Regions:
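PRPP-associated nucleotide enzymes
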Residues: 1-132
């Protein structure tokens, strides 16, 4: 199996692309079903990790939507610091809106917890997390 070296780390393929694409399709199908007929939801991607996932996901969404991104920092290298900082915040109006946070993976849960608290303080109609 081919390995890729990035800086001082070696990586090998864990999940083939086809399985990832299938999973994204299943997630999109569920979102399409759950949000059919609702007012335009706001998808909020957590950079940098969610960028490609969100791109592939949005291509499969069958209703009008709005996109935004935030950038958070909670790591020093590959280690969690336990402290989440907003580098790029959410500037969109949230009150009364359906919001879907898009994250590539949930590791410690600290970034997602930070996002949920920030959204709840802004009174969305609903809030959900979509993660690969």
């Amino acid at each position: 199996m081919k390995t890729i070296r990035l800086h001082d780390k070696n990586f090998r393929l864990a999940i083939p692309n086809g399985r990832i694409c299938d999973a994204i399709g299943r997630v999109a199908d569920r979102i399409n079903k759950d949000y059919a007929g609702r007012e335009t939801p706001l998808f909020v991607g957590v950079l940098n990790g969610s960028f490609m996932f969100m791109t592939d996901l949005i291509k499969k969404i069958e209703f009008q939507n709005e996109l935004s991104f935030v950038k958070l920092a909670s790591y020093d290298g590959t280690c969690s610091t336990g402290c989440v900082k907003s580098l790029i915040g959410l500037n969109n109006p949230i009150e009364g809106r359906h919001v879907i946070i898009v994250e590539d993976i949930v590791d410690t849960g600290e970034s997602i917890e930070h996002m949920i608290k920030e959204l709840e303080a802004r009174n969305p109609a609903s809030g959900e997390v979509c993660t690969l």
